[in-house]
C-alpha cells in the first residue's frame, strides 16, 4: 500500500511511540515520504519555503521513525517516532502545548 499523492501534499501526524503523545503535524510530498522511508528519519515539505526539510537537521532534535500508517483513503499519514529532544521549534516537547478547553 502506498500513499496517494495525486492531490498534492499529505498531512503527517507525528506521534511519540512510547507515550502516544501527538508531537506535531507537518506535510509530506512524495519525495519527503521516500526520504523518510530510506533514512528512517522524518522529512517534510515546507509549504512556506516550498522545499524539503529534515526534522532536527539543524537543532539535533531528530525523529527516529518506528512505524508509518496510512489512513483508509491513503491521503494521510501517521508517523510513530522516537523523539530526541523537544519536537517543537519553540523548545516545547510537543507543538500542541496550547490548551484551549
UniProtKB/Swiss-Prot annotation:
Pfam family, one: PRA-CH
EC number: 3.5.4.19
Localisation: Cytoplasm
Domain of life, per lineage: Bacteria
Cofactor info, note text: Binds 1 Mg(2+) ion per subunit. Binds 1 zinc ion per subunit.
GO biological process, one term: L-histidine biosynthetic process
Binding site for Zn(2+): 72, 88, 95
Main location: cytoplasm
The keyword Magnesium is annotated on this UniProt entry: yes
Catalytic activity annotation: 1-(5-phospho-beta-D-ribosyl)-5'-AMP + H2O = 1-(5-phospho-beta-D-ribosyl)-5-[(5-phospho-beta-D-ribosylamino)methylideneamino]imidazole-4-carboxamide
GO cellular component, one term: cytoplasm
Single GO MF annotation: phosphoribosyl-AMP cyclohydrolase activity
Primary enzyme class: hydrolase
Keywords tagged on the record: Amino-acid biosynthesis, Cytoplasm, Histidine biosynthesis, Hydrolase, Magnesium, Metal-binding, Zinc
Cofactor(s) named in the record: Mg(2+); Zn(2+)
Binding-site residues, Mg(2+): 71, 73, 75
Function as written in the Swiss-Prot or TrEMBL entry: Catalyzes the hydrolysis of the adenine ring of phosphoribosyl-AMP.
Subunit structure: Homodimer.
Annotated family: Belongs to the PRA-CH family.
UniProt-listed NCBIfam families: PRK00051.1
Entry protein name: Phosphoribosyl-AMP cyclohydrolase
Source organism of the structure: Bacillus anthracis
Amino acid at each position: 500500500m502506498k500513499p496517494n499523492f495525486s492531490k498534492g501534499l499529505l498531512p503527517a501526524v507525528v506521534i511519540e511511540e512510547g507515550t502516544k503523545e501527538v508531537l506535531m503535524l507537518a506535510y509530506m510530498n512524495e519525495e519527503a515520504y521516500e526520504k523518510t522511508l530510506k533514512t528512517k528519519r522524518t522529512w517534510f515539505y515546507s509549504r512556506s519555503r516550498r522545499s524539503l526539510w529534515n526534522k532536527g537537521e539543524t537543532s539535533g532534535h531528530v525523529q527516529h521513525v518506528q512505524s508509518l500508517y496510512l489512513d483508509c483513503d491513503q491521503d494521510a499519514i501517521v508517523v510513530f517516532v522516537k523523539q530526541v529532544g523537544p519536537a517543537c521549534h519553540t523548545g516545547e516537547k510537543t507543538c500542541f502545548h496550547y490548551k484551549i478547553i
